[in-house]
């Protein structure tokens, strides 16, 4: 196991197109860190730089106590799990697991020990003599993970490994990956664009935007105190409602909100908004009259899509099956403690 340290890492193409913009990050020994962000934010490029598959333009990358800027990928003591499994189709599962170890001249007895240990942990013992074409997508992904595990590396690097799986299997596999990582205690860096994967798997999240870090923290820290409007809308589903401060009475802050000078944006998560009853005095953060435009039933709860009097959209959540009708007018509100305030630059200005 090893910590991974990135110090002011930059990556440019053609000398003037910078895609990684001075990223500094320390990943602790045994930590599971998830790099998350939209397409094109630089998360996969950053992972490939750690792996040695992409060169860096400036800065340093250390694995353990060793700077690995100029170290070949095979010598970095890392193992990578890819989206496309990367299995040899003509080999059995056992042969796929053993291939890398044989290339490193690992003794036969040690190879068998590692294969048996990984196969048991991944519950693929009954598939060892099968070839990849005889396996399901989930089973193939377990084999790909097994090939990484038998390496017994200093760190695991996961590049969107669940993207090819269906929704049910993704849920199962993310639980298995996290369980295995905890049992092995291996430092892990995991890339995904799926914020649900990120929230449920990470010890810490690193939210990337256009090649730089927007925020680093635990999933609950990023959810409850997003550092910017970008993080606020990226983390959480449905995303946080963001509304510019209006001059009209369509949507006004309540008495408990202290406003910063200059332009500002209010943020409220859908689950923090409730429909107000007559005489309700608890909505001291904001309250507004809205018109219901759509109702989505998603099992144990409903999402109501509404419009403010100035036409701006607002989404909020109610428990169970909503009894409200399209075009119905309702008053909604939230407590001051649930209102997030962001300045004109999009950065958080309130606790």
UniProtKB/Swiss-Prot annotation:
<dbReference type="Pfam" id="PF08402">
    <property type="entry name" value="TOBE_2"/>
</dbReference>
<dbReference type="InterPro" id="IPR012340">
    <property type="entry name" value="NA-bd_OB-fold"/>
</dbReference>
<dbReference type="InterPro" id="IPR003593">
    <property type="entry name" value="AAA+_ATPase"/>
</dbReference>
<keyword id="KW-0472">Membrane</keyword>
<dbReference type="InterPro" id="IPR027417">
    <property type="entry name" value="P-loop_NTPase"/>
</dbReference>
<dbReference type="GO" id="GO:0001407">
    <property type="term" value="P:glycerophosphodiester transmembrane transport"/>
</dbReference>
<keyword id="KW-1278">Translocase</keyword>
<dbReference type="InterPro" id="IPR008995">
    <property type="entry name" value="Mo/tungstate-bd_C_term_dom"/>
</dbReference>
<dbReference type="GO" id="GO:0015430">
    <property type="term" value="F:ABC-type glycerol-3-phosphate transporter activity"/>
</dbReference>
<dbReference type="InterPro" id="IPR047641">
    <property type="entry name" value="ABC_transpr_MalK/UgpC-like"/>
</dbReference>
<dbReference type="GO" id="GO:0055052">
    <property type="term" value="C:ATP-binding cassette (ABC) transporter complex, substrate-binding subunit-containing"/>
</dbReference>
<keyword id="KW-0762">Sugar transport</keyword>
<keyword id="KW-0547">Nucleotide-binding</keyword>
<dbReference type="InterPro" id="IPR013611">
    <property type="entry name" value="Transp-assoc_OB_typ2"/>
</dbReference>
<dbReference type="GO" id="GO:0008643">
    <property type="term" value="P:carbohydrate transport"/>
</dbReference>
<dbReference type="InterPro" id="IPR017871">
    <property type="entry name" value="ABC_transporter-like_CS"/>
</dbReference>
<dbReference type="GO" id="GO:0005524">
    <property type="term" value="F:ATP binding"/>
</dbReference>
<comment type="subunit">
    <text>The complex is composed of two ATP-binding proteins (UgpC), two transmembrane proteins (UgpA and UgpE) and a solute-binding protein (UgpB).</text>
</comment>
<comment type="function">
    <text>Part of the ABC transporter complex UgpBAEC involved in sn-glycerol-3-phosphate (G3P) import. Responsible for energy coupling to the transport system.</text>
</comment>
<keyword id="KW-0997">Cell inner membrane</keyword>
<protein>
    <recommendedName>
        <fullName>sn-glycerol-3-phosphate import ATP-binding protein UgpC</fullName>
        <ecNumber>7.6.2.10</ecNumber>
    </recommendedName>
</protein>
<dbReference type="GO" id="GO:0016887">
    <property type="term" value="F:ATP hydrolysis activity"/>
</dbReference>
<feature type="binding site">
    <location>
        <begin position="37"/>
        <end position="44"/>
    </location>
    <ligand>
        <name>ATP</name>
    </ligand>
</feature>
<keyword id="KW-1003">Cell membrane</keyword>
<dbReference type="InterPro" id="IPR015855">
    <property type="entry name" value="ABC_transpr_MalK-like"/>
</dbReference>
<dbReference type="Pfam" id="PF00005">
    <property type="entry name" value="ABC_tran"/>
</dbReference>
<comment type="similarity">
    <text>Belongs to the ABC transporter superfamily. sn-glycerol-3-phosphate importer (TC 3.A.1.1.3) family.</text>
</comment>
<feature type="domain" description="ABC transporter">
    <location>
        <begin position="4"/>
        <end position="235"/>
    </location>
</feature>
<dbReference type="InterPro" id="IPR003439">
    <property type="entry name" value="ABC_transporter-like_ATP-bd"/>
</dbReference>
<keyword id="KW-0813">Transport</keyword>
<keyword id="KW-0067">ATP-binding</keyword>
